[in-house]
């Protein structure tokens, strides 16, 4: 049950999951239609939360969460007019298309994003934008600017950089690393100051 080409098949899957539970049919239908989806930013956030709890448990200084963690983002789902818009096509973006639809994925690919800073948060943002396919169409682009150079102390928290990148431009190095992750991404890098504090 890896793809759901018709409304009928996702309805059947929703009924199969329901069993004897008292669950809203809309919730089950949303689950059945999107359970094959994969969203890199959500996986990164959940993975980060899980890793933090493991460190708490192993370190013994802080108490980890000792309960189920439930994450619900149904409000982010678009209304479903057609299942055809959410069919898998064998693309690297199928995990996103299954959840949000082909039209949304096309808008992501045509987006033009200006990102100030290629530090810790900038590296994470660039990775997420590349995984989502932002700036992959001829009209789309990611522009990243950062005046800084990579220092050895950056390597532990800015994961796009390696030891041999020390002394290099953060913007250029981050752009190269992102293009290795997703060669279709159009990235321009600048080394200009944006504001008084940037």
PLM feature spans:
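Adenine nucleotide-associated cytosolic modules
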Residues: 1-3, 7-198
